[in-house]
Amino acid sequence: MPQLLTPPLSPLIIAVLNGNIEYTSELLQNGVDIDVRDKNGNSALHIAASKGYTKIATMLLLYGATIDAPNFELATPLHYAAANNYKDLTQYLLNMNANKSAVNKYN
């Protein structure tokens, strides 16, 4: 049976996963697709929120990342920040007008 391959991650997703602020900044300055997704529909902002990377999340939003973009489970970056108890990042996303009423597929 043939093996299914996972699509490669974009450089932006990799930079954010690794918490690499400098490379993330360089990619954004060079016009990378800011709303690129991984295999689960997570954007770079979802990943930053899930890891508590407030500086990277701020940078992504300054470059126009979609704050309420849902992934395949309808979760937004705010869901990830709140679920992981990243209080400062959760508050920042709320201050940036993230939809606090957004519902994912589990609630």
Swiss-Prot record:
Pfam families: Ank_2
Keyword annotations: ANK repeat, Repeat
Protein origin, superkingdom: Bacteria
ANK-type repeats, residues: 7-36, 40-69, 73-102
Gene3D superfamilies noted in UniProt: Ankyrin repeat-containing domain
Key word Zinc present: no
InterPro entries: Ankyrin_rpt (IPR002110), Ankyrin_rpt-contain_sf (IPR036770)
Name of this chain's protein: Putative ankyrin repeat protein RP714
